[in-house]
């Protein structure tokens, strides 16, 4: 039987390794106990507590869960209040206006006139808004009812006309109250009763100058051109509108030349949004009054 000889130094190193392993195990156990002291109910020694420690509180789990659900519900309601970019119709409008602005800059760099560029841009913007932002049905019905009420009031006023015994001054005041027109225009001259021949004369003179452009004062202290074609209205509707201008029916009955620029300005200021944006209303009233006085003086 062979004998195995063990070196004493190897035994000593093995014992040292065992002692180190035991110390390592003891250290690991101590660290585990320290880290799990809060689970065993052992108080933890803290040298310095945070300043906001008083604000900490222990709440019931169910109560905290209810509060969290309530806060989430409120956040959901806030999100419902705001529309997303796909739902907000003003987002594409802003993009469209940015594109129009870039187009205006490019045209101005090529040397085109500013008033021409601006007039076209305004027309495009108005058309875009009218197409993408239609008026509500309730508003249209309210406008129709208001217009019907005004027509009934005018019919009642015309049926209760003053007698012949009243003076001419009272007739003039009544006609000036019933007639309509832009502010600043003097309605002292009254219209006489018209018939088919008067409407035919008015329509004839307007048709002859339907595409002729007239100068009007603009908001930018300049002028711009406008004609009857840009009203996008039927000739019969234009004739009915201009009959409300004082003196027009009398001049048409006498076969006189009519103040077409005054008539165009009156109709456009009431029925054209683009014209309302471009024109200087104060200067327009004075211009129409001057034209009317000049034609009535002949």
Swiss-Prot record:
<dbReference type="GO" id="GO:0039563">
    <property type="term" value="P:symbiont-mediated suppression of host JAK-STAT cascade via inhibition of STAT1 activity"/>
</dbReference>
<dbReference type="Pfam" id="PF03012">
    <property type="entry name" value="PP_M1"/>
</dbReference>
<dbReference type="GO" id="GO:0039564">
    <property type="term" value="P:symbiont-mediated suppression of host JAK-STAT cascade via inhibition of STAT2 activity"/>
</dbReference>
<feature type="modified residue" description="Phosphoserine; by host PKC">
    <location>
        <position position="272"/>
    </location>
</feature>
<keyword id="KW-0922">Interferon antiviral system evasion</keyword>
<keyword id="KW-0597">Phosphoprotein</keyword>
<feature type="region of interest" description="Disordered">
    <location>
        <begin position="61"/>
        <end position="80"/>
    </location>
</feature>
<comment type="function">
    <text>Non catalytic polymerase cofactor and regulatory protein that plays a role in viral transcription and replication. Stabilizes the RNA polymerase L to the N-RNA template and binds the soluble protein N, preventing it from encapsidating non-genomic RNA. Also inhibits host IFN-alpha and IFN-beta signaling by binding and retaining phosphorylated STAT1 in the cytoplasm or by inhibiting the DNA binding of STAT1 in the nucleus.</text>
</comment>
<keyword id="KW-1048">Host nucleus</keyword>
<dbReference type="GO" id="GO:0044423">
    <property type="term" value="C:virion component"/>
</dbReference>
<dbReference type="GO" id="GO:0003968">
    <property type="term" value="F:RNA-directed RNA polymerase activity"/>
</dbReference>
<comment type="subunit">
    <text>Homotrimer when phosphorylated. This trimer is stabilized by binding to the L protein. Binds soluble protein N, and ribonucleocapsid. Interacts with host STAT1, STAT2, DYNLL1, DYNLL2 and PML. Isoform P3 binds host PML.</text>
</comment>
<dbReference type="GO" id="GO:0042025">
    <property type="term" value="C:host cell nucleus"/>
</dbReference>
<feature type="compositionally biased region" description="Basic and acidic residues">
    <location>
        <begin position="144"/>
        <end position="154"/>
    </location>
</feature>
<keyword id="KW-0693">Viral RNA replication</keyword>
<feature type="compositionally biased region" description="Polar residues">
    <location>
        <begin position="156"/>
        <end position="180"/>
    </location>
</feature>
<keyword id="KW-0143">Chaperone</keyword>
<feature type="region of interest" description="Disordered">
    <location>
        <begin position="144"/>
        <end position="192"/>
    </location>
</feature>
<feature type="short sequence motif" description="Nuclear localization signal">
    <location>
        <begin position="212"/>
        <end position="215"/>
    </location>
</feature>
<dbReference type="InterPro" id="IPR049506">
    <property type="entry name" value="RABV_P-like_C"/>
</dbReference>
<protein>
    <recommendedName>
        <fullName>Phosphoprotein</fullName>
    </recommendedName>
</protein>
<feature type="short sequence motif" description="Nuclear export signal">
    <location>
        <begin position="49"/>
        <end position="58"/>
    </location>
</feature>
<dbReference type="InterPro" id="IPR037199">
    <property type="entry name" value="PP_M1_C"/>
</dbReference>
<keyword id="KW-0946">Virion</keyword>
<dbReference type="GO" id="GO:0019083">
    <property type="term" value="P:viral transcription"/>
</dbReference>
<keyword id="KW-1090">Inhibition of host innate immune response by virus</keyword>
<keyword id="KW-1035">Host cytoplasm</keyword>
<dbReference type="GO" id="GO:0052170">
    <property type="term" value="P:symbiont-mediated suppression of host innate immune response"/>
</dbReference>
<keyword id="KW-0945">Host-virus interaction</keyword>
<keyword id="KW-1114">Inhibition of host interferon signaling pathway by virus</keyword>
<comment type="similarity">
    <text>Belongs to the lyssavirus protein P family.</text>
</comment>
<feature type="modified residue" description="Phosphoserine; by host PKC">
    <location>
        <position position="211"/>
    </location>
</feature>
<feature type="modified residue" description="Phosphoserine; by host PKC">
    <location>
        <position position="163"/>
    </location>
</feature>
<dbReference type="GO" id="GO:0030430">
    <property type="term" value="C:host cell cytoplasm"/>
</dbReference>
<dbReference type="InterPro" id="IPR004259">
    <property type="entry name" value="PP_M1-like"/>
</dbReference>
<keyword id="KW-1105">Inhibition of host STAT1 by virus</keyword>
<dbReference type="GO" id="GO:0039502">
    <property type="term" value="P:symbiont-mediated suppression of host type I interferon-mediated signaling pathway"/>
</dbReference>
<keyword id="KW-0899">Viral immunoevasion</keyword>
<keyword id="KW-1106">Inhibition of host STAT2 by virus</keyword>
């Amino acid at each position: 039987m062979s004998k195995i000889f063990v070196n004493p130094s190897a035994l000593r190193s093995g014992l040292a390794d065992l002692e180190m392993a035991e110390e390592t195990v003891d250290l690991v156990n101590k660290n585990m106990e320290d880290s799990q002291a809060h689970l065993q109910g052992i108080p933890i020694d803290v040298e310095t507590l945070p300043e906001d420690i008083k604000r900490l509180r222990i709440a019931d789990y169910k109560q905290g869960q209810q509060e969290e659900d309530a806060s989430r519900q409120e956040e959901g309601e806030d999100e419902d209040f705001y529309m997303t970019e796909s739902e907000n119709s003003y987002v594409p409008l802003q993009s469209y206006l940015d594109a129009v602005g870039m187009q205006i800059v490019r045209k101005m760099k090529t040397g085109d006139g500013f008033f021409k560029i601006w007039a076209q841009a305004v027309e495009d913007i108005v058309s875009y808004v009218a197409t993408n932002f239609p008026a509500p049905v309730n508003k249209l019905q309210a406008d129709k009812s208001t217009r019907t009420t005004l027509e009934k009031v005018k019919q009642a006023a015309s049926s209760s006309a003053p007698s012949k015994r009243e003076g001419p001054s009272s007739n003039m005041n009544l006609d000036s109250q019933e007639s309509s027109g832009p502010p600043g225009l003097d309605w002292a001259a009254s219209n006489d009763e018209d018939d088919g021949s008067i409407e035919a004369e008015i329509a004839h003179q307007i048709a002859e100058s339907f595409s002729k452009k007239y100068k009007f004062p603009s908001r930018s202290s300049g002028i711009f051109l406008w004609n009857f074609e840009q009203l996008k209205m039927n000739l019969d509707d234009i004739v009915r509108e201009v009959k409300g201008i004082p003196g027009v029916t009398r001049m048409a009955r006498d076969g006189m030349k009519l103040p077409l620029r005054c008539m165009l300005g009156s109709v456009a200021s009431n029925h054209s949004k683009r014209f309302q944006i471009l024109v200087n209303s104060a200067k327009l009233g004075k211009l129409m009054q001057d034209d009317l006085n000049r034609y009535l003086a002949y």
